[in-house]
Every structure is written in structure tokens, then in C-alpha cells.
Amino acid sequence: MFANISIAEFDPELAQAITNEDARQEAHIELIASENYCSPAVMEAQGSKLTNKYAEGYPGKRYYGGCEYVDIIEQLAIDRAKELFGADYANVQPHAGSQANSAVYLALLNPGDTVLGMSLAHGGHLTHGAKVSFSGKTYNAIQYGLNPETGEIDYEEVERLALEHKPRMIVAGFSAYSQIVDWQRFRDIADKIGAYLFVDMAHVAGLVAAGVYPNPVQIADVTTTTTHKTLRGPRSGLILAKANEEIEKKLQSAVFPGNQGGPLVHAVAAKAICFKEAMAPEYKAYQQQVVKNAQAMAEVLIERGYDVVSGGTKNHLFLLSLIKQDITGKDADAWLGAAHITVNKNSVPNDPRSPFVTSGIRIGTPAVTTRGFGEAEVRDLASWIADILDSKGDEAVINTVKAKVEAVCAKFPVYAK
């Protein structure tokens, strides 16, 4: 029998670290584009007794007994995911976005097959063919990028590379791209060479669910996403697809037993909650505000003389190039962090610096919008960022901004006390 004691009583060292992180989230402004704050209901599911249950297999086809209630939970998540995104197929078992992506590769490709994906240096993701990832090591990865004049995806280059290399799969999606992706253009290119089209919409899934960003699910052969970021659920993954019995069977077996063992049932339950939350009327208003906030911040920073890659944003994020100011992303990250503004350093197209230093930062608005910030607050925030960057990290300026950050964080708490 377990002793009925708290973490603080049993493990004060760990408890203190958790307490400190709770305080940090309340006292810092979160602008990392891939982060958000999930609801208390999502966290309740994550911390439930479901964490005790093993459930290898799928609803009605388990390798373990005692799964009758787990089956209900997983089926709820599946049905809600399909309804939310207009999908014919959903697999809610992937532990994370990268695991969802690796399952797609396993399902549709053989080692050595050619894949065409977006370059990490131009806004793609590790799993889109980067040399340091399984996707670039196991497969012959060809990379496309942005048009240097427009800062947008160079679809002519995508088509040229596709016709030249004949990839078996084209990957569309991004981790740092601020414009609307033309999913149909990718479909047309893929069809010219008989390739699969795989879309990774991890960053914009919440926007897609709310109808404020184009939905790729019925255009692509397979679509994946994380369930956090803009979707505002648990840190986990999801695979979606339009009707295709052959692909569905391959995806099922690629997730289990091909890529994973049993699902994390507590995370599956949390996904079911997050999908239901995304069906609420207020969710669309939230996602619309996310985009408005990102656009407002980009406008202010452009007015202050900073370069935004592709000239602005039509989603939840943008890349700020600091090449003109001769500021490294690493320094900008540190200076802003000292003022309790959390961003991440990020490479920009044709970046002369290494990925560990970079010449830019990535800014996203999902978390601050969850917190309740509107355009007035984020315009102030963008001005504070510019103040710190203009001063090259002057301590007095950082302290002045930090005081303003503390005041606005107190006004807009993440979670009710």
C-alpha cells in the first residue's frame, strides 16, 4: 500500500524544482512558438490512474485483458480527431510528433527511398530529411527551401527537384514558416511523379481545427501533427488520413508493433479532451486572436527597423532576422530571457552562423494568447523586445522591461490561483 504523502514530503528536491517551474511559467512571457498552456482538464487526464494501464493493440484487438474502458477512451479520441479535422482515419497512439512522422516513413517507404522535404535551415523540421535525423540517415533526403526574393516556399524549385529526383514521398510542413502553405500545389507536384504527399501540420493544427488555416487532410495521403503547440493539448502525436484502406493498414501496423509498444493511455485520454475543447465555439475566436497577435507583433518590429522573414506572418509565428543588426540569436535569446521573455534562437535563410549561435529568433503567440493577451498587450511586448535588442542587452533596459513583464504577468495569470 502506498503511503499517502505528497511529492513535497517524499522528494523535496524534486518538489522544489516543480514549484520553481510553476512560478517561472507564471512570471515569464512565453513566446516559443511550439509551446502553449494546456487546460486543467488535460492535466487531470495526464495525471490519472490511466497511467497504470498497458494496452498494446487497438480498440477491440488488445493483447492485454482489462481494456474495456481503455477501448472507450481511445475510440472517443479517434472519433473526435476524425470529426475535428475531417479525416477518414485517425491513429491517436503516437507518443509525439516525431514518432508519428517516423511511423509514416515506416509505413510508406523502404530504407534508401528518396524523400523531398523542406530544409531545416529554411524552416523545415528535423524529421523532414535533416542529416542528423533518422529521416536523413535512413532515406535519400533531398531538400527544398525558400525563394530568396520573397521569403516564401519556392514551389518552382520543389517541382524542379521532384521531376529531377523522383522522390517516393514529398513532405510538406514546417517548424518555422510564417506564410500559408499551398497544399494543393504540393499535391499537384506529387501527382506528376506518382509520389505520396505527406503533410506535417504540427505547428498549425489548432489553426486548421478552427478553420483559420487551410486544412490539408483531404489533400495529402497522410497528415501528422503534435497535439500541443497551437492545438493546446498534451505533448503527444496524431496521424490522420483520407480514405485509403491500404495506407490505413500500413499506418496501423507501422505505429504498433512497428514503431511503438503500448500507447500512453493517460495521454490518449488527454487528447480526447483537447479535441473536444477544440470543438467549442470560443476556440475559433482564440485561434483568430493568435494570428492577429502574431501579425501585430511583426508589424511593430518591422516599424522598429527589424527584418521579418517573408515580410510578415499569416499564422501564429514569425522569424526575426538579426543579421542587419549584427546580433546573434544566442545573445538575443539570453538578453530577452533575462527580462523574463522566453524565445528561441533560430536559424534564418542563408544564415552565416551555426545552428548553435544563429542570426535570428523565432516568435510565436499561442501561449500569450491563451494567457489573455490581445493586440494592445502584444504591441507593447514587441516594443519591449525591440528596446532590449536596440540596447544590445543593456542591463538597465533589461531591468526596466523585466519590471513591465512582471506587472503584465500578474495582470494575466496563466492559471487561476
Curated annotation (Swiss-Prot):
The pathway to which it is assigned is:
One-carbon metabolism; tetrahydrofolate interconversion; Amino-acid biosynthesis; glycine biosynthesis; glycine from L-serine: step 1/1
The subcellular localization recorded is:
Cytoplasm
Can you cite an annotated GO cellular component?
cytosol
Pfam families for this protein = SHMT
- The chain residues annotated with the modification N6-(pyridoxal phosphate)lysine are K229
Q: How does it assemble?
A: Homodimer.
**Which residues are involved in binding (6S)-5,6,7,8-tetrahydrofolate?**
L120, G124, H125, L126, S354, P355, F356
Kindly state which reaction or reactions the protein catalyses: (6R)-5,10-methylene-5,6,7,8-tetrahydrofolate + glycine + H2O = (6S)-5,6,7,8-tetrahydrofolate + L-serine
Instruction: Write down the required cofactor(s).
Output: pyridoxal 5'-phosphate
Name of the gene: glyA
Q: Which InterPro entries match?
A: PyrdxlP-dep_Trfase, PyrdxlP-dep_Trfase_major, PyrdxlP-dep_Trfase_small, Ser_HO-MeTrfase, Ser_HO-MeTrfase-like, Ser_HO-MeTrfase_PLP_BS, SHMT-like_dom
Record keyword Ribosomal protein present: no
Supply the enzyme class, top level: transferase
Task: List the source organism.
Answer: Acinetobacter radioresistens
Q: Which GO terms describe its biological process?
A: glycine biosynthetic process from serine; tetrahydrofolate interconversion
Descriptive protein name: Serine hydroxymethyltransferase
Instruction: Sum up the protein's function in the record's words.
Output: Catalyzes the reversible interconversion of serine and glycine with tetrahydrofolate (THF) serving as the one-carbon carrier. This reaction serves as the major source of one-carbon groups required for the biosynthesis of purines, thymidylate, methionine, and other important biomolecules. Also exhibits THF-independent aldolase activity toward beta-hydroxyamino acids, producing glycine and aldehydes, via a retro-aldol mechanism.
Keyword terms, alphabetized: Amino-acid biosynthesis, Cytoplasm, One-carbon metabolism, Pyridoxal phosphate, Transferase
Q: Which GO terms describe its molecular function?
A: glycine hydroxymethyltransferase activity; pyridoxal phosphate binding
Q: Where is this site: Plays an important role in substrate specificity?
A: H228
- Family indicated by similarity: Belongs to the SHMT family.
UniProt EC number: 2.1.2.1
